[in-house]
């Protein structure tokens, strides 16, 4: 009986202390110097975090924050890192950010580069990478851009598109 009490005591006292809560850090807008609303998040291959923020794309390297505002000061709704590029979607525009020779992120509009005609008031909420294709989803269309061939496709929907999903190489919406 004493052995049973000791065993129970040991398990309750010591095993209860082995579970730790993972560290959670909260960053208020005053720390990262941008708006308080973030719409999306992605992580690049070099482990930097990127956030779609009301004032641009936020970059966090684990210790420092840097804001990359859009040229037209529009809200960034979506962000997706892929290789050396960080794709973003905003108000009537989508494109990518890439580092120049000085290490600064520079924005390139794919709407301008490909000569894409977007709808009035269109915003881009989700970005997916599928093989050589980059997909930008608004509430009524999905724009597909092939990075190798530079071909574009537009999928229109009579219903609102709330999100897109990649399941084993097949896109669902």
Residue ranges and their predicted role:
Residues 1-173:
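Carboxylate-rich, polar loop motifs that coordinate divalent cations or form catalytic acidic clusters
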